[in-house]
Amino acid sequence: MYTLKKSLGQHFLKDEGVCRQIISVLQERPVERLLEVGPGGGALTKYLIEWPSIEFLAVELDEEKVEYLQKTYPSLQGKIIHQSILEIEPPFVGSFTVVGNFPYNISTQILFHLLEWRSQVECAVGMFQKEVAERVAAPSGNKVYGVISVLIQTFFTVEYLFDVHEQSFNPPPKVK
Protein backbone atom coordinates (compact mmCIF):
# COMPACT_ATOMS: atom_id res chain seq x y z
CA MET A 1 0.00 0.00 0.00
CA TYR A 2 1.29 3.50 0.76
CA THR A 3 1.65 6.01 3.58
CA LEU A 4 0.16 9.48 3.77
CA LYS A 5 2.58 12.37 4.02
CA LYS A 6 1.36 15.33 6.04
CA SER A 7 4.20 17.47 4.67
CA LEU A 8 2.66 17.16 1.19
CA GLY A 9 -0.84 18.01 2.41
CA GLN A 10 -2.11 14.56 1.48
CA HIS A 11 -5.82 14.01 2.07
CA PHE A 12 -6.98 11.38 -0.38
CA LEU A 13 -10.48 11.32 -1.76
CA LYS A 14 -12.19 8.07 -0.76
CA ASP A 15 -15.86 8.77 -1.54
CA GLU A 16 -16.80 6.98 -4.77
CA GLY A 17 -19.91 9.14 -5.14
CA VAL A 18 -17.79 12.30 -5.19
CA CYS A 19 -15.38 10.68 -7.67
CA ARG A 20 -18.30 9.89 -9.98
CA GLN A 21 -19.61 13.47 -9.65
CA ILE A 22 -16.24 14.85 -10.74
CA ILE A 23 -16.08 12.43 -13.66
CA SER A 24 -19.61 13.40 -14.66
CA VAL A 25 -18.65 17.09 -14.74
CA LEU A 26 -15.63 16.28 -16.91
CA GLN A 27 -17.77 14.29 -19.32
CA GLU A 28 -20.00 17.31 -20.02
CA ARG A 29 -17.45 18.58 -22.54
CA PRO A 30 -15.17 16.93 -25.05
CA VAL A 31 -11.73 16.08 -23.68
CA GLU A 32 -8.82 15.09 -25.90
CA ARG A 33 -5.90 15.62 -23.53
CA LEU A 34 -6.18 15.37 -19.75
CA LEU A 35 -3.72 16.14 -16.96
CA GLU A 36 -4.51 14.80 -13.50
CA VAL A 37 -2.77 16.73 -10.73
CA GLY A 38 -1.88 14.74 -7.63
CA PRO A 39 -3.47 11.36 -8.38
CA GLY A 40 -2.37 10.06 -4.96
CA GLY A 41 -3.98 6.66 -4.44
CA GLY A 42 -5.81 6.72 -7.77
CA ALA A 43 -9.40 7.49 -6.66
CA LEU A 44 -10.04 9.50 -9.85
CA THR A 45 -7.31 7.89 -11.92
CA LYS A 46 -9.05 4.52 -12.09
CA TYR A 47 -11.96 6.20 -13.90
CA LEU A 48 -9.87 8.53 -16.05
CA ILE A 49 -7.65 5.84 -17.56
CA GLU A 50 -10.74 4.00 -18.82
CA TRP A 51 -11.81 6.90 -21.04
CA PRO A 52 -11.44 5.98 -24.67
CA SER A 53 -9.48 8.15 -27.07
CA ILE A 54 -7.88 10.59 -24.63
CA GLU A 55 -4.24 11.37 -24.12
CA PHE A 56 -3.78 11.06 -20.34
CA LEU A 57 -0.94 12.21 -18.11
CA ALA A 58 -0.68 12.59 -14.35
CA VAL A 59 1.73 14.66 -12.30
CA GLU A 60 2.63 13.34 -8.83
CA LEU A 61 5.43 14.54 -6.55
CA ASP A 62 5.43 11.62 -4.09
CA GLU A 63 7.63 8.78 -5.36
CA GLU A 64 5.82 6.21 -3.21
CA LYS A 65 2.51 7.16 -4.88
CA VAL A 66 4.10 7.02 -8.34
CA GLU A 67 5.31 3.47 -7.65
CA TYR A 68 1.93 2.48 -6.21
CA LEU A 69 0.03 3.86 -9.21
CA GLN A 70 2.33 2.20 -11.74
CA LYS A 71 2.02 -1.14 -9.95
CA THR A 72 -1.76 -0.88 -9.49
CA TYR A 73 -2.49 0.51 -12.97
CA PRO A 74 0.10 -0.87 -15.43
CA SER A 75 -1.37 1.28 -18.22
CA LEU A 76 0.13 4.31 -16.43
CA GLN A 77 3.69 3.30 -17.30
CA GLY A 78 5.27 6.35 -18.93
CA LYS A 79 2.25 8.53 -18.17
CA ILE A 80 3.19 9.86 -14.74
CA ILE A 81 5.35 12.97 -14.45
CA HIS A 82 7.24 12.58 -11.17
CA GLN A 83 7.51 16.26 -10.21
CA SER A 84 5.58 19.04 -8.56
CA ILE A 85 2.86 20.59 -10.72
CA LEU A 86 4.44 23.93 -9.78
CA GLU A 87 7.72 23.02 -11.48
CA ILE A 88 6.63 21.63 -14.83
CA GLU A 89 5.97 23.19 -18.19
CA PRO A 90 2.68 22.48 -19.97
CA PRO A 91 2.82 18.71 -20.56
CA PHE A 92 0.94 18.73 -23.87
CA VAL A 93 1.27 20.47 -27.19
CA GLY A 94 -2.06 22.17 -27.73
CA SER A 95 -5.00 22.59 -25.40
CA PHE A 96 -5.79 20.30 -22.49
CA THR A 97 -8.04 19.84 -19.46
CA VAL A 98 -6.82 19.68 -15.85
CA VAL A 99 -8.44 17.70 -13.05
CA GLY A 100 -7.41 16.99 -9.51
CA ASN A 101 -8.02 16.80 -5.82
CA PHE A 102 -5.51 19.61 -5.33
CA PRO A 103 -3.42 19.66 -2.15
CA TYR A 104 -5.07 22.37 -0.06
CA ASN A 105 -1.71 23.74 1.09
CA ILE A 106 -0.71 24.70 -2.49
CA SER A 107 -4.06 25.10 -4.24
CA THR A 108 -3.73 28.87 -4.72
CA GLN A 109 -0.24 28.38 -6.15
CA ILE A 110 -1.65 25.76 -8.53
CA LEU A 111 -4.27 28.25 -9.71
CA PHE A 112 -1.58 30.86 -10.41
CA HIS A 113 0.39 28.19 -12.28
CA LEU A 114 -2.67 27.35 -14.39
CA LEU A 115 -2.98 31.06 -15.17
CA GLU A 116 0.49 30.88 -16.72
CA TRP A 117 -0.85 28.06 -18.93
CA ARG A 118 -4.14 29.83 -19.69
CA SER A 119 -3.67 29.75 -23.46
CA GLN A 120 -3.64 25.93 -23.29
CA VAL A 121 -5.96 25.08 -20.39
CA GLU A 122 -9.47 24.61 -21.78
CA CYS A 123 -11.02 23.59 -18.51
CA ALA A 124 -9.97 22.78 -14.95
CA VAL A 125 -12.11 20.77 -12.55
CA GLY A 126 -10.60 20.73 -9.11
CA MET A 127 -11.27 20.00 -5.50
CA PHE A 128 -10.28 22.99 -3.40
CA GLN A 129 -10.56 24.00 0.21
CA LYS A 130 -14.02 25.58 0.51
CA GLU A 131 -12.59 28.99 1.44
CA VAL A 132 -10.40 29.05 -1.69
CA ALA A 133 -13.25 27.88 -3.94
CA GLU A 134 -15.53 30.58 -2.54
CA ARG A 135 -12.89 33.27 -3.16
CA VAL A 136 -12.21 32.10 -6.71
CA ALA A 137 -15.93 32.01 -7.55
CA ALA A 138 -16.94 35.17 -5.64
CA PRO A 139 -18.81 37.80 -7.65
CA SER A 140 -17.61 41.41 -7.73
CA GLY A 141 -18.71 43.21 -4.60
CA ASN A 142 -18.73 40.07 -2.43
CA LYS A 143 -16.68 40.42 0.77
CA VAL A 144 -14.33 37.56 -0.27
CA TYR A 145 -13.85 38.89 -3.83
CA GLY A 146 -10.16 39.64 -4.25
CA VAL A 147 -7.06 39.33 -6.40
CA ILE A 148 -7.46 35.59 -7.05
CA SER A 149 -11.13 36.15 -8.00
CA VAL A 150 -10.24 38.90 -10.47
CA LEU A 151 -7.34 37.03 -12.08
CA ILE A 152 -9.04 33.67 -12.49
CA GLN A 153 -12.36 35.16 -13.62
CA THR A 154 -10.59 37.36 -16.18
CA PHE A 155 -9.40 34.30 -18.08
CA PHE A 156 -11.79 31.51 -17.08
CA THR A 157 -15.50 31.00 -16.48
CA VAL A 158 -15.73 29.90 -12.86
CA GLU A 159 -18.45 27.71 -11.42
CA TYR A 160 -18.67 26.51 -7.81
CA LEU A 161 -20.01 23.00 -8.30
CA PHE A 162 -20.66 21.29 -4.97
CA ASP A 163 -19.52 20.89 -1.37
CA VAL A 164 -17.69 17.78 -0.20
CA HIS A 165 -17.86 16.58 3.40
CA GLU A 166 -14.52 16.24 5.15
CA GLN A 167 -15.31 12.56 5.89
CA SER A 168 -14.98 11.95 2.13
CA PHE A 169 -11.20 12.11 2.60
CA ASN A 170 -8.55 10.00 4.28
CA PRO A 171 -7.52 11.49 6.62
CA PRO A 172 -10.32 14.04 6.98
CA PRO A 173 -8.89 17.57 6.59
CA LYS A 174 -9.26 19.99 9.50
CA VAL A 175 -10.72 22.57 7.11
CA LYS A 176 -13.68 22.27 4.75
PLM features: residue spans?
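Catalytic cores of RNA-modifying enzymes
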Residues: 1-176
